[in-house]
């Protein structure tokens, strides 16, 4: 397990950060990335172990925790643990339509339980995914859970940059649809 000092520091920060509005958490993570890049490799390993323990300690993983894991994996881990870059496997959107549906459906469902509002948010972003000949469908809640989101994000990272850019734009439109 992580060192006592790091665990204590993390616990004290958690008490300060917990009351923050959900919308403030990702910008806070973004600010923390710069400081975390200055960790020594051994400290990064401790940080990763502590983060894993904190996320798993309540026996469930929520959407923010999944996103936090993905951010750390994508933006920090390569700096401390060199890995070969992922090889692009998807050059068109067609094979990624199910993954786009999962992602956009999950994002649409985050801010509302009202199906009409969820559908409106989904439709605000769907055209920006640029699936051309294939229409995107809003998925029911049970088809866009954390496991499905994780799998979709993993596959989407293997797409060419333009597809990623389009999906980012679509995601922003979905999230922004609730005002």
Which functions belong to the PLM regions below?
Residues 1-56, 63-179:
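Small-residue-enriched hydrophobic alpha-helices in membranes
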């Amino acid at each position: 397990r992580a060192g006592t000092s790091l665990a204590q520091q993390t616990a004290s920060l958690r008490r300060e950060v917990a009351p923050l509005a959900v919308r403030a958490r990702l910008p806070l993570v973004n600010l923390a990335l710069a400081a975390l890049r200055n960790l020594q490799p051994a400290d990064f390993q401790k940080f990763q172990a502590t983060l894993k323990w904190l996320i798993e300690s309540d026996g469930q993983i929520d959407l923010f925790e999944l996103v936090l894991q993905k951010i750390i994996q994508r933006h920090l881990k390569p700096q401390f643990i060199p890995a070969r870059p992922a090889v692009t496997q998807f050059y068109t959107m067609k094979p990624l339509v199910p993954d786009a549906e999962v992602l956009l459906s999950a994002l649409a469902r985050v801010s509302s339980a009202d199906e009409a509002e969820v559908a409106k948010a989904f439709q605000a972003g769907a055209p920006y995914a640029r699936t051309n000949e294939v229409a995107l469908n809003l998925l029911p809640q049970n088809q866009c859970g954390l496991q499905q989101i994780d799998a979709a994000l993993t596959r989407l990272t293997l797409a060419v940059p333009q597809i990623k850019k389009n999906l980012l734009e679509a995601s922003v439109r979905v999230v922004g649809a609730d005002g």
